Amino acid sequence: MDNNNDFWKFSDQLRLESGLANLSLNDYSIWSNSYSSKRPDQRRNFDVKGSDFNNNNNSSKAFDDDFNDGWKITNSNGPLFSMPHNNNNNTLEVGGFNKGGGIYSNTNTTISSYHPNNLNNNAFGGFNKGIYSNTTSSPYLNNNHHHLDDNNNLNRNNLKGYKTYFKGEDQFHTPKSAKKKNTTNNTNNKKHGDNTNNNDGTKTGAEKKFKTLPPSESLPKNETIGGYIFVCNNDTMAENLQRQLFGLPPRYRDSVRTITPGLPIFLYNYSTHQLHGIFEAASFGGSNIDPTAWEDKKCPGESRFPAQVQVITRKVCEPLEEDSFRPILHHYDGPKFRLELSVPEALSLLDIFANQNSFDDIFKAIPA
């Protein structure tokens, strides 16, 4: 009994001590506002993980009452020291601080941000509203928040005083100087007629443009070529027949190479819109078989129609009018028709020519 009485006497003496506020734990006082007298670099952070200070079940009436002035020595029901009672049933922040009453409290924060519905059960949410709240004097307090998974908490912990020196477009987009440089390179490639990613600028626009025919102007790859139509006008037709050589512009070079000896050939005169036949390929299709044919005056030694093939006249027939042969051909882009003939198309044209009497037969039928 004597020991118990001595203990309670000692307890009463401690409660009356005026220097109780200076009692310290871990080299600093946590029991009174004398904690605020220390400099920020002398204050030690502490782990409130798992603490039960942040309670969301408290009444929202706490936000309309006065501030509680931090931790105070109060007469409580607990032994020696206890957490202060809040007679107004106010919500306590971490360390017992109410809204704005705690050390490093954010004076710029609105009342709505402290509503219990906005608080998080995570103790860290209350911690930032307590002694280490967000303030303009401590702009880098948000450095160690990555261990929390609550994105809502992180959003509320953004600092008003923190200023970033990088724009969003600098972090997620290509720098403007690099964009400009790439645009310049692409422009140079287009000027040289090179639409690929290589840096070879030696190709001319004509060579790139006329290398091959588009799919609409050529037969499908899995279809066999059955014949070919060459084109001329009134100025070039005589040279075609005299040289027994037909030619087309450079863009038809690859297409003409598919011609083999014995393939049916037809000649279309777009000045008269008539189709002449019947001719037969005497050579493989090639390029510049006779460079002097249709020679280009600007480039001596080069033909204006380098996609060439040698032919022989298989049968002289009356030319066909457009109405008779156009329904057979494959058309694209309006009146244009494909020069490469499939096997059915070539056979149909041969049948039409066969129904025409040759000039020789007509002359033989005339009596002398």
From Swiss-Prot:
One CC-aspect GO term: cytoplasm
Regions of compositional bias (Basic and acidic residues) in chain numbering: 38-50
Gene Ontology biological process: response to endoplasmic reticulum stress; response to water deprivation
Predominant location category: cytoplasm
Biased composition (Polar residues): 52-61
Annotated gene: NRP-A
TM region positions: none
DCD domain mapped to chain residues: 223-355
Record region (Disordered): 35-61, 171-218
Further comment found in the protein's record: Overexpression of NRP in protoplasts induces caspase-3-like activity and promotes extensive DNA fragmentation. Transient expression of NRP in planta causes leaf yellowing, chlorophyll loss, malondialdehyde production, ethylene accumulation, and induction of the senescence marker gene CP1.
Bias kind Low complexity: ranges: 195-204
This protein's UniProt keywords: Cytoplasm, Stress response
Organism phylogeny: Eukaryota, Viridiplantae, Streptophyta, Embryophyta, Tracheophyta
Task performed by this protein: Involved in stress signaling pathway that mediates cell death in response to endoplasmic reticulum (ER) stress and osmotic stress.
Cross-referenced InterPro entries: Dev_and_cell_death_domain, NRP-like
Induction: Induced by infection with an avirulent strain of the bacterial pathogen Pseudomonas syringae pv glycinea. Induced by infection with the fungal pathogen Phytophtora sojae. Induced by copper, cycloheximide and reduced glutathione. Induced by tunicamycin, azetidine-2-carboxylate (AZC) and osmotic stress. Induced by dithiothreitol (DTT). Induced by wounding.
Domain of life: Eukaryota
Name under which the protein is recorded: DCD domain-containing protein NRP-A
Family annotation (PROSITE patterns): DCD (PS51222)
Subcellular localization(s) per the UniProt record: Cytoplasm
